[in-house]
Amino acid sequence: MEQFKTYALMTGLTLLFIWFGGMIAGQTGMVIAFLVAAGMNFYAYYYSDQQVLSHYHAEPVDRAHASGLYQIVEKLTRRAGLPMPALYIIPEQQPNAFATGRNYEHAAVAVTEGLLDLMTDEEIEAVIAHELSHIKHYDMLIGTVAATIAGAIAMLANFGMFFGSGDRDRPNIFVMLALMFIMPMAASIIQMTVSRNREFMADEGSARMTGHPEWLQSALTKLDNYARSITLPEADPQTAHMFIINPFSGKDVSLKQLFSTHPSTEARIERLEALK
């Protein structure tokens, strides 16, 4: 069922992109948008995981090099009924983590050195359980495709005035200009809403997997505080939604709540409290 929801969302966002192309440049725009969307979805599906791991200089590790982490992940994957994901460590001091990959068999979990150095074993277990919940519900693919299509719509809007069409039913210039401003914002809101809802679901999944909601509450509190004082130099806004805590938490951003990739830490802790 979760895989069906994933592909349904991918299809819906792709159709939105194609429709936007048609509104800007008629049938020609629809064809171009379809080809661009197909190419971007193909790339996102097969290669986005390696791209993001490379961007953060993540190094693969095994049981011999990270036995404690490996044992935690191994225990939780058995409990969740998941295959063992590939494990990576990011050489950064901000405590954080993310999951990536297109399905159960091609999943990876990456944690920073800061997470391993500054968190307790219980907090690390809660964070790993959160990331495994993302894997279980195909959230990595959903987030990747949502970000890809949102970026594509913004790109199409930026170049919208250069598309031409001979179709007589093309909307007037005022409608087209309005769409060029509205559609990228709408796509971003869809992306952020999807991301926030999935964070709540993964938090709940972590609490149920470990049986200790308080472990994740403690982890989220510390992660949020550290994110405000320790930067993640390689952090990219396009991948911020992947992390358990927004790596930009310490920065002031206009319209922060509307366009935040994560619900507030306070809201997440409050929801976890209800699970006790």
Swiss-Prot record:
Its cofactor is Zn(2+). It comes from the Bacteria. PANTHER family: PROTEASE HTPX. Binds 1 zinc ion per subunit. InterPro entries: HtpX_protease (IPR050083), Pept_M48_protease_HtpX (IPR022919), Peptidase_M48 (IPR001915). This is Protease HtpX homolog. One of its GO terms (cellular component) is plasma membrane. HAMAP family: Pept_M48_protease_HtpX. Its EC number is 3.4.24.-. It comes from Sulfurovum sp. (strain NBC37-1). Belongs to the peptidase M48B family. Zn(2+) binds at H130, H134, E199. Keywords: Cell inner membrane, Cell membrane, Hydrolase, Membrane, Metal-binding, Metalloprotease, Protease, Transmembrane, Transmembrane helix, Zinc. The chain crosses the membrane at residues 16-36, 142-162, 173-193. The keyword Protease applies. It is found in: Cell inner membrane. The gene is htpX. Gene3D superfamilies: Metalloproteases ('zincins'), catalytic domain. Pfam families: Peptidase_M48. GO terms for molecular function: metalloendopeptidase activity; zinc ion binding. The lineage of its organism: Bacteria, Pseudomonadati, Campylobacterota, Epsilonproteobacteria, Campylobacterales. It is a multi-pass membrane protein. One of its GO terms (biological process) is proteolysis. The active site is at E131.
